[in-house]
Amino acid sequence: MAITKEDIIKALEEMKLTELNELVKAIEEHFDVVASAGVAVAAGPAVADAAPSEVAIMLTNAGGQKVAVIKVVKEVTGLGLMDAKKLVDGTLPVAIKENVKIEEADAIKAQLIEAGASVEYK
């Protein structure tokens, strides 16, 4: 029986952030590549079309494991426990953190998804 894309995706979803980081590094070493997004070159200056360097992390759904999501929100925002709980329990979508560099936002997003939340960038 061959491994399908769905099997791989399911396995990746079950991995922790640190395990995913190690996997990316192993793939980079094994295939002698660098995991970075390709950049398309436009004919003229297209500054307005460029991807933003900073984003706001929006919590769209806390999921079924609110306690885990609250812990992550508390950790990444520096809020107290009650303030983090109010943020998660409040009206969604809500900005968890604003003006975050893409690299940091990806790490925070992975933590929130691992805790069971749904997240998007704005």
Swiss-Prot record:
GO terms for cellular component: cytosolic large ribosomal subunit
SUPFAM superfamilies recorded: ClpS-like (SSF54736), Ribosomal protein L7/12, oligomerisation (N-terminal) domain (SSF48300)
Described function: Forms part of the ribosomal stalk which helps the ribosome interact with GTP-bound translation factors. Is thus essential for accurate translation.
Annotated protein name in UniProt: Large ribosomal subunit protein bL12
Protein keywords: Ribonucleoprotein, Ribosomal protein
GO biological process, any: translation
UniProt record similarity statement: Belongs to the bacterial ribosomal protein bL12 family.
GO molecular function, one term: mRNA binding
Gene label: rplL
Organism of this sequence: Mesoplasma florum (strain ATCC 33453 / NBRC 100688 / NCTC 11704 / L1)
